[in-house]
Every structure is written in C-alpha cells, then in structure tokens.
Amino acid sequence: MYAQAAIKPNTLLRNGAYGIVMRGVQKCTCAGASLRGRNSAPLCCINLDTATDPACGTAGFLVSASEYIRNKYEDTMTPEQWDHFGGEMFTGFDTDRTMLRISAMNLMLHSIGNPDVDYRDSVSKQNQIRGKYTVCLANPPFKGTVDAGSINDDLKAVTDTKKTELLFLALFLRMMKTGGRCACIVPDGVLFGSSKAHKSLRKELVENHQLRAVISMPSGVFKPYAGVSTAVLIFTKTGAGGTENVWFYDMKADGFSLDDKRSEIEENDIPDIIERFHNLERESTRQRTEQSFFVPKQEIADNNYDLSINKYKEVEYIPVEYPPTSEILADIERLNREIETEVQELKKLLEMGKSDL
C-alpha cells in the first residue's frame, strides 16, 4: 500500500507543490531555521525502529531515513511494518510552525501517511520525553542561545550552558533508549571548545557512552546559507561507557562544489565514508597520515576530550632539496648581468630615438 503511495517522490518534489514551497522557503529567513544538506543525510541513515529529529526543520533527515528503509526493505516488509512505517516510526519537533507544515508535507509525499511532527521547544522544560526512541537523526541549530530559565534541568546537569548546539546533544542522550544510536551534525566548536560546558559534554559522550565516529566536513557543505565548518558525530547511548577507539574521517568533497552555487562535481567522499564505516574492522591498520584512522579513547581523554581531527592527524612533509648557496648566488649574478645588458641596449635605443628627432 505505502510502497505505491509515492511512486516517483523526486518528481513530485521537483515539480509539485512541495518544490514550489521549498523554493519560497529558501528565500526566507526564519529565526533559527536550518535548511538541511540533503547530500549529507545518507551518512546518518541506519536500520531504524523509531526515529526522531528534535529540530526537524523541513524533515530532510527523516525523509532520507524513510527512503533508506524503502530502498532496502520494501520487498520484505509486512503490512504491519508498513503501518508502522507510515505512522509512528518517524517523529519530528520544531518551534517554527511554517517549517512544521512543510515537514508534514515532505513526509506525506514520501509515503509517511500520518507524520508525527509537533510544535515543541525541545530543550525547554516543556519537553519531558526520555528513553523513547531508538534512533536520533538531527542537525540542531548552530550558534544559538536560549533563555536560561526555560532550559530543562536534566540537560543542564550534563552541560551547563545556554548554547543550543551543546544542549541538543544532551537532549539526544535523554530522549533515546539505552542502545539508541545518534547521528547529528554539529559546528566545529563543539569538537574543540575550551569552556567547561564543551568539555563536560565531550567527556559525557566518550566516558559514559560509546562515541563511534567523528566525520569532519568541509566548510562549504551548507552554502549558500552558512559557511560554518561542521562535523557528524555518531554515538550510541549506553550509560555505561563503551568507547574504545573513535574513528575519524576527513571529508574533502561531498559531490558538490563548495561555493555558493553548489554545482555537482565528480569528487565525492560520501560513498567511501559509508563503505568504511560499515567495515570498521578494516580500518585498524590505517595511519594518521591517511584520510581516516582510529584514535584510542585514552589519547582523546589526555587531550581534554578534543575531537577535532587536526589534533590527531599527522601531516607528512616532503623534504625540499635546494641547490648549494654558491649555485644560487651564481644564478643571481648571471641574472644581474643579463638585466644590465638589457638596460644598456634600452638606453642605446632611447638615444637613437632622440637623435632622429
């Protein structure tokens, strides 16, 4: 039933009402709204039971997750599973009613017949959800702050801050069941920030849960809307630790140019990232000079839980051999003689010109 409900969702999105709405949205500036990098979303799509995006925007991540499930399991899903797929499997929250309407339309056009998207300030005391979801896929607001009095006390216990990018990470941990998996996009500052709130949040992920991967992305992936450098954090909620080695990947290209035009290009690291992430046992021999490698938990702890790849990446410098000093000086003297000869010839030509006058 649901398999036939959206035969060509891409065509609908491109030419239908949703495409028109999205083109309009791209021109507006809704406070705190973040238009998702759709090309990055497949990194976050894993086998799902119940998924949430507490800052869903246009529901780009949830749609990508639904497409992943359709492509992989469509032929084997039971009617009960399709009912679950079209109903309670995907949940989103946002504080912008326009975005909620768009996200509902987006999900319905992708076979989610009863999208569960609600108006809710996810990091406020209003949100009391805990231990409910098995997967969290999110791109929370960057560089924002919220009123200190409205922040849920549970979140402040993990990271005492007003910064949304930190509060949402603490929120993901609270909203997921034990064993739940999260893939979220964060600004680079989360990885190396030196404040107490930054360090305590990173320590929470590394020491009390299982941080699996840090995928650094180039700064242009969100252009023309934002030029901030970002990364994908992938972790599992355990409440009992589990981090042994963290996998780092330095993404150079995502299939699109990194300027404001974001034109398609051949270079694309995303297929390589997905392949390597699903075969991490092969990564143990990778060197720090390569594009991806493991870093032991203890080394991360010794570096104040810094999660920036540049902290651990080794740059292989190729030595440059220069000629002897005597040879360089001889070349300089030769060039000076050539210049002097040319100057003298130029003077002669100028003198000849004067005599002709």
Question: Which residues does each predicted region cover?
Answer:
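Long recognition/docking surfaces used for binding and targeting
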Residues: 1-26
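Intrinsic disorder/low-complexity segments
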Residues: 8, 26-27, 31, 37, ...
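Local alpha-helix boundary/kink/capping signal
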Residues: 15, 23, 60, 146-147
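N-terminal leader/targeting segments
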Residues: 16-18, 23-25, 41, 195, ...
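Hydrophobic beta-strand core residues of beta-sandwich domains
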Residues: 24-25, 29-30, 45, 176
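Conserved S-adenosyl-L-methionine
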Residues: 31-138, 143-145, 154, 162, ...
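A conserved structural/catalytic subdomain of Rossmann-like adenosyl-cofactor enzymes
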Residues: 124-357
